[in-house]
Amino acid sequence: MPEFPPPIDPSYVPSVSLTRIPANAPIEDILAVLERDGGLILTDIISSQDVAAINDELDPYVQKARAESHAAYDLIPKQTIMVPGIVGKSPTMAKIAEYEVIDKLRTMVLQKKCTATWEDRTEEFTIGPLLNSSLTYNVSYGGPRQRLHRDDMIHGIYHHDGEYSLSNETMLGFMFAGCKTTRENGATMAIPGSHKWNHTRVPRTDEVCFAEMEPGSAFVFLGTVYHGAGHNSVPDQVRKVYGLFFISGTLRPEENQFLAIPRSKVLGMSDKMLSLLGYKKPETWLGIVNNGDPAENLKEVLDMANS
């Protein structure tokens, strides 16, 4: 990939902004804004105590990581330290992944309700979401901005003109602020409404706004929204963001959850998390082992896999 693009001119004033909604607002109100704009900021979704706990739990991994240790991501600059698989490293992040508002949003957006036609009958079934990846983004001073992009490009998703339907979305992301995020220290750029664009429309930097947040808030966005990390121009300041990204259960996760999360940790996880990681089969036969649901006797299945 070519060199990273130059920073956005500091004199640029956005003509749009991201709607801010309390995390305890009615789920229908949150979903309506998400469908309209493609992204929003949920305020106060994580307590200050949990923000501190996440920072403490992940700091040892951040200290051991190298800024350039993300070879698979050529869109991430060297000034960014990424720690992968954080639901297996931070018990607090694993707990947050099961928050009611997060669970409801990912289910309402990503759960697929399907009908199968047989010779003599039809059957209805659902396929729940999966965890796509869980990561830290620690962006140091001088980190350049990313190119504007859509996250769903990893699955080769194409977008066509016509009536928009939220049911066609395949990805939903939550980026939690581990510190105060500002335009100056690299707050995520986003283009509200771009989730309804066709595949050929090219995003412009004069269409972006910035996901500026207080610690504990989250930028929630669809995989169809054009966005990108901003440029950190503040000396001695690191922008800390923690990401949880979910996909439809019919797609292959970006992060291989069977290898990213230690199996010793998996055995102690909830049924909800086992489903998100892909260890528990949905109502179809996806993910079976030995002709059955691996979650029914997970220790035995993992012992077999380790033999």
Swiss-Prot record:
Pfam families listed in its UniProt record: PhyH
Cofactor: Fe cation
Family annotation (InterPro entries): Phytyl_CoA_dOase-like
Molecular function as annotated in GO: dioxygenase activity; metal ion binding
Keywords attached to this entry: Dioxygenase, Iron, Metal-binding, Oxidoreductase
Similarity comment text for this entry: Belongs to the PhyH family.
Subunit structure: Homodimer.
Task performed by this protein: Dioxygenase; part of the gene cluster that mediates the biosynthesis of swainsonine (SW), a cytotoxic fungal alkaloid and a potential cancer therapy drug. Swainsonine production occurs via a multibranched pathway and is dispensable for fungal colonization of plants and infection of insect hosts. The first step of swainsonine biosynthesis is the production of the precursor pipecolic acid (PA) via conversion of L-lysine (Lys) to 1-piperideine-6-carboxylate (P6C) by the aminotransferase swnA, the latter being further reduced to PA by the reductase swnR.
Protein name: Dioxygenase swnH1
Lineage, opening ranks: Eukaryota, Fungi, Dikarya, Ascomycota, Pezizomycotina
Gene it is expressed from: swnH1
